[in-house]
Amino acid sequence: MTSYRERSADLARFYTVTEPQRHPRGYTVYKVTARVVSRRNPEDVQEIIVWKRYSDFKKLHKELWQIHKNLFRHSELFPPFAKGIVFGRFDETVIEERRQCAEDLLQFSANIPALYNSKQLEDFFKGGIINDSSELIGPAEAHSDSLIDTFPECSTEGFSSDSDLVSLTVDVDSLAELDDGMASNQNSPIRTFGLNLSSDSSALGAVASDSEQSKTEEERESRSLFPGSLKPKLGKRDYLEKAGELIKLALKKEEEDDYEAASDFYRKGVDLLLEGVQGESSPTRREAVKRRTAEYLMRAESISSLYGKPQLDDVSQPPGSLSSRPLWNLRSPAEELKAFRVLGVIDKVLLVMDTRTEQTFILKGLRKSSEYSRNRKTIIPRCVPNMVCLHKYIISEESVFLVLQHAEGGKLWSYISKFLNRSPEESFDIKEVKKPTLAKVHLQQPTSSPQDSSSFESRGSDGGSMLKALPLKSSLTPSSQDDSNQEDDGQDSSPKWPDSGSSSEEECTTSYLTLCNEYGQEKIEPGSLNEEPFMKTEGNGVDTKAIKSFPAHLAADSDSPSTQLRAHELKFFPNDDPEAVSSPRTSDSLSRSKNSPMEFFRIDSKDSASELLGLDFGEKLYSLKSEPLKPFFTLPDGDSASRSFNTSESKVEFKAQDTISRGSDDSVPVISFKDAAFDDVSGTDEGRPDLLVNLPGELESTREAAAMGPTKFTQTNIGIIENKLLEAPDVLCLRLSTEQCQAHEEKGIEELSDPSGPKSYSITEKHYAQEDPRMLFVAAVDHSSSGDMSLLPSSDPKFQGLGVVESAVTANNTEESLFRICSPLSGANEYIASTDTLKTEEVLLFTDQTDDLAKEEPTSLFQRDSETKGESGLVLEGDKEIHQIFEDLDKKLALASRFYIPEGCIQRWAAEMVVALDALHREGIVCRDLNPNNILLNDRGHIQLTYFSRWSEVEDSCDSDAIERMYCAPEVGAITEETEACDWWSLGAVLFELLTGKTLVECHPAGINTHTTLNMPECVSEEARSLIQQLLQFNPLERLGAGVAGVEDIKSHPFFTPVDWAELMR
C-alpha cells in the first residue's frame, strides 16, 4: 500500500485564471480552473471551474496572507495583490494585472499544504463545475461556450460531493484534537486563527498551526482539498455523499456536547461506508474507505464508552454524572413553542398545556448571556429524585426554554406558613399592611322589634357559595400570616357580602391587658345605645318563608358532605316546638364597626409541638374577615307566649397601639366583643388550597342524634357550620380507612337554652392525622348527642387535637369558652332579666385545653348564674374579673404560640431534600440559593425541588432575596469558593425555620459568625438542635456534609435515625 508521502509526490496542482469577461451586471469576472494531476498516471485528472470577480480574489488574498504570516512570520515572501481602483478598472491593463496577481496567489498556495488545505480555499472553489478525467478531452475551456450559459451551471452545481468526500478523509487524530480543544478550553488550530467550522465543511481539517509543522506529510495530506485517492465516477459516489452528511452531523453533535447523538451518527455513517465499499472497483479507493471506516468506528466506540447511558442493571444505583447528558431527542426546535398554550403565570414561570396531548407542563425561560463562556459546561440532569423532571428543552436565539413537570401540590410553604410565626411583612413576597389610626369597639345586644327575613334568606343562600378551601394566611398571630408566592393559584375566595366593610388592614395592640386598660378608661357614650330591630317570634307560629330559605340551596348536591350536614339543619324547627327565625338588618353602627381591630378577637388553643399538622378550629371560625352574622336567641316557650328582644349598642373609642414588632409573640389582634362571637367568613384568601379533607363518614350517627328529640337552633351554628367547617377537599386527598377516621368525639357549641330542656343540636370536629408524616392533615365533621360542643385532644398523644372549642353552660361543666356577657344598662353591674326582655351579648372564645378535661377545674370566667331562680340569664363579673380575663388571655396566647410543626414531618421532608441535593452534587450542580420558593410538593405530598441545571450559554445567578434572608451560605457572593457545602447551609436554614417557626434572619438579624449560638425553643429535640448547629457553621470546611464522607455524615446523623434511605432512593 502506497504511503501518503508517495501519493503526495504523485499529485501536482495547477491553477489558471483566464477569460476575463464583463458580467451582465456590469463587473468583470475571471474564469478560475484548478487541476490535480497524478504524476504516475497523467490521464487521471480532476478539474474544478469557477467564475470569480476581483473582490473575491482580494478577500482570498487577505485570508491566505494572514494564515501565512501566522505560520512563517515572513509576510514579505507572500505575493502582493493589485490595489483596487474606481476609475479605469475596466482598462485592459488593469484587468490583466488583476488576473496575473490572482493566478500568482493561487499558484503560490499550491506549494504550501497549510494554504491549499485551508477552509478559505475550500470556500473559494465551492459551487464550481467538477470534471473528471474522462470528460477532460480537449481544452478545458470547451465546457463554457458562453459566459451567460455557464453562470446558471455555477449556481446550481454544488461542490458538496467533493467536500463530502473530503469529510471522509479526516483522521481520528484531528477529531481527537478538536474534542480535546473543547474539553480543555484550549485554543485549537481553528480558534487560533479565528476560523470556525461551518455545517457544510465541519469535517474538513483545521488550518495548520505551529504544531502542524511537526506532523507527518501523511497527516497533512489526509486533509487535502484534493485527496490522494481520486474520486470515483459520479454514478458511484452516492454512498460517499450520504456517509459524509452523517459524519458532518456527528461532528456537529460532538461540538454541542451531545455525545450520544454523535455516536449514533458515526455508526450510521460507518454502516453506509461498509455497504457501499463492497462494489468499489478501485483498490486504492477501497482501502481508503476501509481505513476511514475503521477510524470512525473507533471514534464512535470511544464516545460510547465515555458518555454512554447506564446499563439496565444499573438503574437502581444512585444517579451520577451519566444522567447529566440528556437524550438528544429531548431537544426540540423553536417552532414547537407554537404547540403550547399558556394557562397562567406562576411566579416567574408559565403554566402551559400541550395542545397536541392536552398535558400540563411548566415552561421556564432562561435568558442567554451576552458573554459566552466555555468554562461553564452544560449539565442537564434528568434522573434526580425528588426534583421535577425535564421533558424537553428548546434553544432559541436568545433563550433556553425548559418544559418541566408540573408539581401539582404547589409550594410547601403555602401549607405550613400558617404554623410559622412570621408577620406579613416578613413573608417572602408580601404586600404592605397599613394601620388605622383610630378604632372603635361596639357592643350590641338584641332588642325587640319586627323584622323581615329577607336578609336572612340572602345570607342563607350565600352559605352555599362559602364552601371553599380554607385560607391559610390568617393564623394565631399576625406574624404567622404568610403571603408567599403560590404554585397553585386559581381558587377563588368566598364572595364578600355587600354590607361587609371589613378590611385586612387591621392594627394590633401589644397586649390584651393594654386593651383592657384602655377599655376601662374610655367613657361609654349614652347616645350610642340605639334601638334596633332584631328578631320576631310569635307563639307557635312558624315563619314559613324563613324556614324554606334553608333547604333552598341544599337541593343542588345531596351527596357532598356539606349538603349532608345542612340536611340536619332542617331539623332545627321540630313540629312540637316551632319557632320562627328571621334576620336583622344591617345598621349604620354595625357597618362602622367593621374596621374595628377588635374583630379578630380570639384565643387559639394549640397544644404541644408533637401534634401533627392541622388547622385549629379557632382559626377556622375567626380568621376570616367579612360581616358577622348577628346572634339569634330562642327561649324556652312554656306558655307559647311570644318573646321579644331589645337591642342596645354601646360604643367605646380608643387609640390604636403602635405597630407590633416583627416576630413578637405577644402581638395579638384586637377584636370587638360584637365580632368575637360571630366572625365573618367572606374574607377568604385567594390561591390558598387547604390540605384538610372533609370525610363524610359517621354522618349517620348525626342524623340519629339530631332526631332524638326537639332541637333548638341558634344562628351561631349557621355562621360556624355553613361558612367555616365545610370546605372542598384540595389536591392532597388522603385515603384513610373508616377505622382511621374514628377518634374521640369532641363536644360542640351549645346554644343558649334551658339546661333541663331537650338535647340541643351540636357539631363535633376532629383533628388528627396518621403517624405517617406523608398523610399530612385530616379533618372530619361529626355530630354527637351531647348538649355541648368542643374539640378535645385525643387521649392518644399521636392524635392530639388542635384548636379546642369549649362550652360552659352548666355548673358541673369542666370546660371554658362560651361566655355570656350581660351588658347592663346605665352602667349597673347587676343581673337584669325579665319575662319580656333579655339584653345579652354572646362572646365565643377558644381557650387552652389539656388532654384530660375530666380532671380540670371549672374555669369558666363567665358562667350561667346557677343561683338565679329558673331564669335564663348570665352574670357579668366586676372590673377586677375583666382585668383578669385579659391577663389570662395573654398567658394563653403565649402558650398557644408554642405550637410547632412536628419533627416527624420535618424529618421526612429533610431526608427527601438531602437525597435530591446529593444527586445534584453528583451531577456537578450546586444550587447555592436553595430557599422556600424552590421547595414544592407533588400530588402525594412528597418534596420536589424546582429544576436545577447549568448551561454554558446562561450566566449563573443567585437570588438576592435569598441572600438577604440568610438562606444562602456566607461564602455565596464573596471571594471564597462556592462548594457543595453551600447547599448544606441552605438546608440548615430551611430546617431552622421549619423547626422553630421563625426565619434565621429574624432570630439572628446580625448574621452568624464562628461563635454564634443558635436560638431555638425548648421544644426542639436535641438531635434536631445538633443537626442545625452543624449545618449552620460559618466555616464551610467545618460544616456537616463538607468532610471526607460527604453526604454520608448527614445521613448518619441521629436526627435521621428512623429514615430508611434505601426506600427514599427507590
From Swiss-Prot:
Q: Where is the composition biased (Low complexity)?
A: 448-458, 492-503, 582-593
Q: Which reaction does it catalyse?
A: L-seryl-[protein] + ATP = O-phospho-L-seryl-[protein] + ADP + H(+); L-threonyl-[protein] + ATP = O-phospho-L-threonyl-[protein] + ADP + H(+)
| Entries under SMART domains matching the protein | MIT, PX, S_TKc
Which segments constitute the Protein kinase domain?
A: 344-445, 794-1056
Please give the name of this protein. Ribosomal protein S6 kinase delta-1
A GO cellular component term found in this entry reads: early endosome
Give the organism the record lists. Homo sapiens (Human)
InterPro entries from the xrefs? Intracell_Sig-Traffick_Protein (IPR051866), Kinase-like_dom_sf (IPR011009), MIT_dom (IPR007330), MIT_dom_sf (IPR036181), Prot_kinase_dom (IPR000719), PX_dom (IPR001683), PX_dom_sf (IPR036871), PX_S6K-delta-1 (IPR042132)
